[in-house]
Amino acid sequence: MAKLSLINRDIKRAKLADKYAAKRAELKAIIDDQSKTDEERYQARLKLQQLPRNANPTRQRNRCVVTGRPRGVFRKFGLTRHKLREMAMKGEIPGITKASW
């Protein structure tokens, strides 16, 4: 089990990213728009830099929903390889069977 402080930090980052997603998208659209003046684009870049660092979605870490482990997480299931295998062997994940050929 990962430390609760690290799990809570990632949850906090996810909430912050959701809160500022529209504002970030708006500013990035202005920055990428070639029809805007250089001054407008520069001001948009400064405003983007003023947003909280943790509002950037790339600072989030995929974690296992059961254990909070940050490595070896399968996106489709949200589980680490350990818990995925364990739950698949118990039959707790529908549609997953052990391979045999």
UniProtKB/Swiss-Prot annotation:
Function field: Binds 16S rRNA, required for the assembly of 30S particles and may also be responsible for determining the conformation of the 16S rRNA at the A site.
Source organism phylogeny: Bacteria, Pseudomonadati, Pseudomonadota, Betaproteobacteria, Burkholderiales
Name assigned to this protein: Small ribosomal subunit protein uS14
Quaternary structure, from the entry: Part of the 30S ribosomal subunit. Contacts proteins S3 and S10.
Protein family membership: Belongs to the universal ribosomal protein uS14 family.
This protein's UniProt keywords: Ribonucleoprotein, Ribosomal protein, RNA-binding, rRNA-binding
GO cellular component: cytoplasm; small ribosomal subunit
Listed InterPro entries: Ribosomal_uS14, Ribosomal_uS14_bac/plastid
Biological process according to GO: translation
